Swiss-Prot record:
Family: Belongs to the alpha-IPM synthase/homocitrate synthase family. LeuA type 1 subfamily.
Gene Ontology biological-process entries: L-leucine biosynthetic process
Enzyme Commission code(s) on record: 2.3.3.13
Organism: Shigella flexneri serotype 5b (strain 8401)
Annotated GO MF terms: 2-isopropylmalate synthase activity; acetyl-CoA C-acetyltransferase activity; manganese ion binding
Named cofactor requirement(s): Mn(2+)
Catalyses which reaction(s): 3-methyl-2-oxobutanoate + acetyl-CoA + H2O = (2S)-2-isopropylmalate + CoA + H(+)
Keyword entries, A-Z: Amino-acid biosynthesis, Branched-chain amino acid biosynthesis, Cytoplasm, Leucine biosynthesis, Manganese, Metal-binding, Transferase
Protein name as annotated: 2-isopropylmalate synthase
CC terms in the record's Gene Ontology section: cytosol
């Protein structure tokens, strides 16, 4: 009988470490809701002790996600576990994930400890986590380079202490699939109480083997796979969840396991993660790349037309990619837009219908026809604009030519005040940015600029993603319009609002800290 493989998503924890700019709470929540809709069993959404912002993100997601188990990471440190539990206590169901290094190299050079001390610490911290929840995951960091006898000792002790999931990470992407399968098999042979816990794997792609290692581990008996959407993560990335999920589905004949994933949500979730994280998906990426279902060879095209199974082992529809996308026009009503969003699987609570419809009408007047990808882009940007705004683009004008110095005039609403400035620049976009810097005095430094077409032809929307440096921190901004300069201006305004919000959060945290300090003095 087919057994279920638990899908553990770490896009918002391990995956976020690869980003050039931290995600806002709203952005993290949007991804979390998409993962919930896709049906992930467990989502690891942060490392609460690392910063007040991470604590807030975990708490916000824990409060709103109902159908997936929410997990937070904690080192084998008392404070880490206590803070993780505090951030998660509002969740319907939660897990604490604690870890410690087990390889000889890590124990000697990083921890400056011994294996016996590591085991003692693991036992104590697993028991501490069990005081807060019956669902505790324990990870043996760098398990791939840990001798099997040592690993078995740690695993047995952690299970005896109360760990319900034991995670075996290939932390540096070092092992070969046959080696990794051997580690899992070896644990089943050597650990007498292993039947009391789920064996999980967490692989990295340094040698391009993350998915292969995870599947080999599943074949050897692992029943939880950890990874990130699109394989994002530090260095070469994490195991690509969409690849593992579809491999399990397509090769069920060999693996004899299944997942609880809603496969129809894979493509949409992948695209959302790509957009929000500002990490384009390579065209040749398995499952979700733009070329994954494209056939250019004449022989292949002929074969597919005769029978798709000649050259396709799965269909675009199986991951929710509908090749025929219906369009709406400026004569379409609000109900029609909502109906189309419903058909695409979006709940009204996930976007602002009034804002979406206003933006839809403006775009429809320009383009004539609005397609599914247009609606999704407008809804995505609308989500950004639901966050409090201090800066708002009121007006801009640019003048440039092949022999002229680019000049821009910009008017920004800054809170209750409206300010205007003009500036020259190295092209129209730079001129707009120079004018904005004069208005705000933020003097942000542009680190990355990318432009992506959303749609086809001359009326395609241009999405500009930028990363800017301000006071040692990096901030991400997104802008969307049919005009590239306008998209660029909106992206910079989005950055400014993110900077402003970060400053407001810092002020609020300082205010609360001062309030708590005053209360202590009163007592």
């Amino acid at each position: 009988m087919s057994q279920q493989v638990i899908i553990f998503d770490t896009t918002l924890r391990d995956g976020e470490q690869a980003l050039q700019a931290s995600l806002s709470v709203k952005e993290k929540l949007q991804i979390a809701l998409a993962l919930e809709r896709m049906g992930v069993d467990v989502m690891e959404v942060g490392f609460p002790v690392s910063s007040p912002g991470d604590f807030e993100s975990v708490q916000t997601i824990a409060r709103q996600v109902k159908n997936s188990r929410v997990c937070a990471l904690a080192r084998c440190v008392e404070k880490d576990i206590d803070v993780a539990a505090e951030s998660l206590k509002v969740a319907e169901a939660f897990r604490i994930h604690t870890f410690i290094a087990t390889s000889p190299m890590h124990i000697a050079t990083k921890l400056r400890s011994t294996l016996d001390e590591v085991i003692e610490r693991a036992i104590y911290m697993v028991k501490r986590a069990r005081n807060y929840t019956d669902d505790v995951e324990f990870s043996c960091e760098d398990a791939g380079r840990t001798p099997i006898a040592d690993l078995a000792r740690v695993v047995e002790a952690a299970i005896n202490a109360g760990a319900t999931t034991i995670n075996i990470p290939d932390t540096v992407g070092y092992t070969m699939p046959f080696e990794f399968a051997g580690i899992i098999s070896g644990l089943y042979e050597r650990v007498p109480n292993i039947g009391k816990a789920i064996i999980s794997v967490h692989t990295h792609d340094d040698l391009g083997l993350a998915v292969g290692n995870s599947l080999a581990a599943v074949h050897a008996g692992a029943r939880q796979v950890e990874g990130a959407m699109n394989g994002i993560g530090e260095r070469a990335g994490n195991c690509s969840l969409e690849e593992v999920i579809m491999a399990i589905k397509v090769r069920k004949d060999i693996l004899n396991v299944h997942t609880a994933i809603n496969h129809q949500e894979i493509w949409r979730t992948s695209q959302l993660v790509s957009q929000i994280c500002n990490m384009p998906i390579p065209a040749n990426k398995a499952i979700v790349g733009s070329g994954a279902f494209a056939h250019s060879s004449g022989i292949h095209q002929d074969g597919v037309l005769k029978n798709r199974e000649n050259y396709e082992i799965m269909t675009p529809e199986s991951i929710g990619l509908n090749q025929i996308q219906l369009n709406l026009t400026s004569r379409s009503g609000r109900a029609a837009v909502k109906h189309r969003m419903d058909e695409m699987g979006y709940k009204e609570s996930e976007y602002n219908l009034d804002n979406l419809y206003d933006a839809f009408l403006k775009l429809a007047d320009k383009k004539g026809q609005v397609f599914d990808y247009d609606l999704e882009a407008l809804a995505f940007i609308g989500k950004q604009q639901e966050e409090p705004e201090h800066f708002r683009l009121d007006y801009f004008s640019v003048q440039s030519g092949s022999n002229d110095i680019a000049t821009a005039a910009v008017k920004l609403a800054c809170g209750e005040e409206v300010k205007a400035e003009a500036a020259n620049g190295n092209g129209p976009v730079d001129a707009v940015y120079q004018a904005i810097n004069r208005i705000t005095d933020y003097n942000v430094e542009l680190v990355k600029y990318s432009l992506t077409a959303k749609g086809h032809g001359k009326d395609a929307l241009g999405q500009v993603d930028i990363v800017a440096n301000y006071n040692g921190r990096r901030f991400h901004g997104v802008g969307l319009a049919t005009d590239i300069v306008e998209s660029s201006a909106k992206a910079m305004v989005h950055v400014l609002n993110n900077i402003w919000r970060a400053a407001e959060v810092e002020k609020e945290l300082q205010r609360k800290a001062q309030h708590n300090e005053n209360n202590k003095e009163t007592v």
